[in-house]
Amino acid sequence: MQKAIRLNDGHVVSLGLLAQRDGTRKGYLSKRSSDNPKWQTKWFALLQNLLFYFESDSSSRPSGLYLLEGSICKRMPSPKRGTSSKESDKQHHYFTVNFSNDSQKSLELRTDDSKDCDEWVAAIARASYKILATEHEALMQKYLHLLQVVETEKTVAKQLRQQLEDGEVEIERLKAEIANLIKDNERIQSNQLVAPEDEDSDIKKIKKVQSFLRGWLCRRKWKNIIQDYIRSPHADSMRKRNQVVFSMLEAEAEYVQQLHILVNNFLRPLRMAASSKKPPITHDDVSSIFLNSETIMFLHQIFYQGLKARIASWPTLVLADLFDILLPMLNIYQEFVRNHQYSLQILAHCKQNRDFDKLLKQYEAKPDCEERTLETFLTYPMFQIPRYILTLHELLAHTPHEHVERNSLDYAKSKLEELSRVMHDEVSETENIRKNLAIERMITEGCEILLDTSQTFVRQGSLIQVPMSEKGKINKGRLGSLSLKKEGERQCFLFSKHLIICTRGSGSKLHLTKNGVISLIDCTLLDDPENMDDDGKGQEVDHLDFKIWVEPKDSPPFTVILVASSRQEKAAWTSDIIQCVDNIRCNGLMMNAFEENSKVTVPQMIKSDASLYCDDVDIRFSKTMNSCKVLQIRYASVERLLERLTDLRFLSIDFLNTFLHSYRVFTDAVVVLDKLISIYKKPITAIPARSLELLFSSSHNTKLLYGDAPKSPRASRKFSSPPPLAIGTSSPVRRRKLSLNIPIITGGKALELASLGCPSDGYTNIHSPISPFGKTTLDTSKLCVASSLTRTPEEIDMTTLEESSGFRKPTSDILKEESDDDQSDVDDTEVSPPTPKSFRNRITQEFPLFNYNSGIMMTCRDLMDSNRSPLSATSAFAIATAGANESPANKEIYRRMSLANTGYSSDQRNIDKEFVIRRAATNRVLNVLRHWVTKHSQDFETDDLLKYKVICFLEEVMHDPDLLPQERKAAANIMRTLTQEEITENHSMLDELLLMTEGVKTEPFENHSAMEIAEQLTLLDHLVFKSIPYEEFFGQGWMKADKNERTPYIMKTTRHFNHISNLIASEILRNEEVSARASTIEKWVAVADICRCLHNYNAVLEITSSINRSAIFRLKKTWLKVSKQTKSLFDKLQKLVSSDGRFKNLRETLRNCDPPCVPYLGMYLTDLAFLEEGTPNYTEDGLVNFSKMRMISHIIREIRQFQQTTYKIEPQPKVTQYLVDETFVLDDESLYEASLRIEPKLPT
């Protein structure tokens, strides 16, 4: 048995009496113990951390004691009272004291008064020695601090006393000196012979008034001079100039901080890592990545310190000498600029090392980096010189011509502009690498194929992936279902070589789907994948889906079905995918095109053409290759750009998109159309003379000289009639050297002549009504290659040889579109993707160029692989076509398209080559028109003359007797797209929404919920943003004097932004009560947070900027009533849309969010102004700055990505009417006056 703890009973009794007399809290309480569940009334007294209780207030000895140190006191709810209880009519208030010891039960107490209960709880909560000790320590600290202050004050007082004493001595000395001077003056005056007469008192008064008036007039004149100067243009320019300098100081401080992070967080740690035992990176690679970075940091630290010193001497600001220090160091920047592309390439290569990639992610995770990547920090110096140029432009705009710094600033600007042009080119050329690395970093699993610096980013967006199990069950209702959209929504990224399909996970991270990395060389696009044999079904899906058939080299084939949100978006995706597939296949198939005994191939045609890689007076190239492995154009004349557009040997998707976006800057649509028409009518002019010489030359034909085109009645196609077909036969045993790649390289769309012979029996899913946005041109990806119905023994031997040589015979890329006449033969049953066996029973139709019967089926990749085998692809072609349809017309087409040498004269072969060139020219013209019509339809909606000319041209094409059926079908689809009556969706939806509000009474703000306002504001913002045509983004029209005429929709967006901002401020100031204003602020902040969830970042900035304006921000009494949660949320929203670091937080959020989305337009306008100010549209030689056009096109591409995806929000006219009503909206001056009226300024 444990012994009881002994206490000094007498001392406890004395403390109890002391508590009874001097306790901090005394009174009757009811307590309940564990031994006795009944409530007992006792008299309690609290002394420090001791709680005594007595039988009554007159007891001389306490009944018990509780030590409260470390206990917790809190109120507890009243227990339910029984109806039979005697005390049921009396209200009690309970609280408990919990002790730190778990074994000790809590003390339960109750009172009859709620206020008394609260006071007991508060008193017991403060009854702790620890609290007293803490307060005592704080008081001691204050006491020591006061002692130090007193000592300091004593010292100061002593010094002041000493100064006073010294002052008194000095005063006494001065008094004595004055007294002496007075005596001397009196002596001099007494010696004067004539004493002045006393002046009249009136004269003295007059002189005094005159003196007062002279002083008043002088002060008034001086005040007027000061006021006139303050209002003068010179003073206004100086104020703006000072503001520019202060902004420059802030930007320079931020830039120095960025360089400091680059050097200290990346460069120096990587140098140490390179010296480790197992280095993840070499010293050479570190030097290549960070060339001159440390030197640039030191240079700008010196520049920043000099700038701070100039600011310290304000208002005298001399800046020219600072730039004189910077200019001689520009060679350091030049080395950094020239190395920039190589730096990012080395970085991409190093990131393939897992150890380096892991280490780099650790560095980037540091708080200083703020989730920015190394590529971002390496790009910051590229933007600094253009920023200096903009600053100098503003300084010169506010610097008088006679200013002492004018000439120096002009000289600095000219030198910086020379370097800026080079920098813009380098940024343009490395933008693709940085974009690829940014996307690769967003994918959680990583994606090594994006580390290939030759990949070119084309487009991205959200598509819905439909599982194959639902094939044939897709309808409009199912496509719009939330479950399918949530489960099937995919983030798709199209590159020049691959299609990446991802899902969006938590934290905005991307995850690759199964088979999410698709190589485009293995792809075949089916425009309408569903088996829609009845019109009703086709109308249900609205032609929004398309199918990609993938046939990997080392895995079974599979199919991906994707659904776009609109027909326009589908047209853009399918056009770009087809273009990329053609580009990559044409690059691989070049080795066989026009292959003859003279071994003249298309690569030789390109290599022999110096105009494709050598600078000339009318063209200059960058170091970067485009998607067709041809040098990108940096500067070029308009004529050379049009030549590149119509060059039949290649056409890169990035050049085509940039050209169609920007051609209005340097030419007009009629010139482009005329060039396409001329190429169609005279296709031989689309190939340079040197390439023509190589093409038409052979061992038997040397008649063509350099620069001479072959003379033939077929060289000009208009009104030409087909020549007599040369009928000839050749034995299948004679294996001519043929090119299986029938078409010339058209760059975008190779001929699909082979697809004309593909029947419909074996593949029922390929037939669909012709979509106006469907694929309309011809494609090398649609080749059907097979042997004849009957084979000779030698053919069988060749087939056996092919099989024994390990040739793959997978399903080939087959025809995706059939003529309308074939649709009646469609089988209703679904079949799996076709196999070689499923094609063997096909019967050729129309032009059976190739038949599937022998089982020989080769994809384009197989054909390239076969070039390295003993059996050439051309031999396989001869075997495959040996027993084809024997009609003379078909045999002549085979012979022409195969460009056979054996058995035909050189003149006949030249005619065959011209035939292929005409086919390629036709496809090029139709391909460019298809991209133009589907992606840039507004060009034709706003220009009736252009539309008329295109329609006339297409009608002429369709009536050409030499036109092939697939070409005629392509032209018909373009015509259908161009002539169909479609309402301009962008403007009509906004007009309809505003029309719905007519006659609707404006309801007050309180009648609308935050959710309703956020949704309707998002819908309104999106429609206004969507209505901006992309041509307004060129030329900085929004900053010109005639901005309302040049960019009406951008200005409409700006006015809408300002209207909503003024509406919010007016709504807050409309309330007279402080609490009402605070609740209005809280509600608008809630609206902003909902808009953030809806990805409407424009509205977030509208609301935060409105609340941040001085008329609202100065309302201190109102802000005291706003809750802490609202203030915290407001700060979070402000940080999201902050302009710091060129809107770095907003850019990162946009990069990780899925459309629909409404970005802040001003961010993109700043980027475009940055590009426009830094570089001109034309060089001094009059060449178009195509690198600049490429960068602007990339910005427009991102804007259009957000414009294309719409919100599924139902309009609410009442809420919309409230948002657009301008009746009660105040302007800036009225808002500030209302703010002063509500809370006047405090007197100073």
Swiss-Prot record:
Repeat is among the record's keywords: yes
Signal peptide: none
Compositional bias per record (Acidic residues), positions renumbered to this chain: 818-830
Keyword Manganese found: no
A biological process term (GO) from this entry: postsynaptic modulation of chemical synaptic transmission
Record-annotated IQ domain positions: 204-229
UniProt domain PH: residue ranges: 22-129, 456-582
Pfam families: PH, RasGEF, RasGEF_N, RhoGEF, SOS1_NGEF_PH
Post-translational modification (record): Phosphorylated by PLK2, leading to ubiquitination and degradation by the proteasome. Ubiquitinated and degraded following phosphorylation by PLK2.
Span list, region Disordered: 707-730, 800-840
Keywords: Guanine-nucleotide releasing factor, Phosphoprotein, Repeat, Ubl conjugation
Domain of life: Eukaryota
Effect of S575A: Abolishes degradation by the proteasome
Function: Promotes the exchange of Ras-bound GDP by GTP.
UniProt domain comment: The DH (DBL-homology) domain mediates interaction with RASGRF2.
Protein name: Ras-specific guanine nucleotide-releasing factor 1
Organism this protein belongs to: Rattus norvegicus (Rat)
